[in-house]
Amino acid sequence: MRIRFSKMHGLGNDFVVIDGISQTVRLTPEKIRKLADRHFGVGCDQVLLVEIPEQPNVDFRYRIFNCDGSEVENCGNGARCFAVFVRERRLTGKRVIRVETAGGIIELRVQDDEQVSVDMGVPRLLPEKIPFVADQQAVTYPLDVAGQVCSISAVSMGNPHAVMLVDDVKSAPVGQLGPLVENHPRFPARVNAGFLQVVSRDEINLRVYERGAGETLACGTGACAAVVTGRLRGLLNDTVKVNLPGGSLRISWPGEGHSVIMTGPAVTVFHGQIKL
């Protein structure tokens, strides 16, 4: 089976994007791992699949697969690439695109400067909705990680995030703590681990160890979760510049009960075909 695809990235968080509407695509975990392999495949952090939606009043179904073959609920950087892809492939001419994900419906807006704003939905803070094992909802929770107690905030942006404050992201133990937090038993669906440094009320630095992918150059949902965390802790204003290793995003969140809006770039690197 030969599959047409586009290689894209959002701030270095890179994707293989596949049109599953105009061609027949049957992905298995093994095929996804082959696609994502940087030595024997195309190479990417995640594989994104465009499908016909199952719900009414929605334009597309948006599916996300990690490089280990697991399917996840949402990906913010991927959502921006998704919006650019469906327009480039002429699957739609709309600038406002509604898509269904495993984490819910999100709205994508392609701006005149080709930056893409994504309505990431209302963050979920109830532990059972994340999911996270806790007796009651709180802004911060103590988490025992290999005998060390870390203070984290737990947020779902359609996928689960644990965010901890650090003095300096450059020296943060992302590679050591990241996989331990990701697989912590209090997160039954595993979790993305964010390491947040507050620069000012309008700016933060962030590194994210992604569930099933490891540390990436950028994580859109992680940026949203970090701003939500900072806002709940009283550290940030409602619009924040988030600096990630691959570049910067703008995240806006008025507060509880409101959607998080993420704005940033999406770039097509090349188009290709691969036999799977």
UniProtKB/Swiss-Prot annotation:
> What does the record list as GO biological process?
lysine biosynthetic process via diaminopimelate
Residues reported to bind substrate:
N13, Q46, N66, G76, N77, N159, N192, E210, R211, G220, T221
Pathway involvement? Amino-acid biosynthesis; L-lysine biosynthesis via DAP pathway; DL-2,6-diaminopimelate from LL-2,6-diaminopimelate: step 1/1
Per the record, its GO cellular-component terms are: cytosol
Catalytic-site annotation from UniProt? C75 (proton donor), C219 (proton acceptor)
Q: Catalytic activity annotated for this protein?
A: (2S,6S)-2,6-diaminopimelate = meso-2,6-diaminopimelate
Does the entry feature the keyword 4Fe-4S, yes or no? no
| UniProt subcellular location | Cytoplasm
Output the InterPro entries linked to this UniProt entry: DAP_epimerase_AS, DAP_epimerase_DapF
Q: Does the keyword Amino-acid biosynthesis apply?
A: yes
A Pfam family the protein falls into: DAP_epimerase
Site note Could be important to modulate the pK values of the two catalytic cysteine residues applies to: H161, E210
Q: How does the record describe its quaternary structure? A: Homodimer.
Its function, per the record, reads:
Catalyzes the stereoinversion of LL-2,6-diaminopimelate (L,L-DAP) to meso-diaminopimelate (meso-DAP), a precursor of L-lysine and an essential component of the bacterial peptidoglycan.
Please give the HAMAP family that the UniProt record associates with this protein: DAP_epimerase
Recorded hits in NCBIfam families, A to Z, give:
DapF
Q: What is this protein called?
A: Diaminopimelate epimerase
Q: Which organism is it from?
A: Cellvibrio japonicus (strain Ueda107) (Pseudomonas fluorescens subsp. cellulosa)
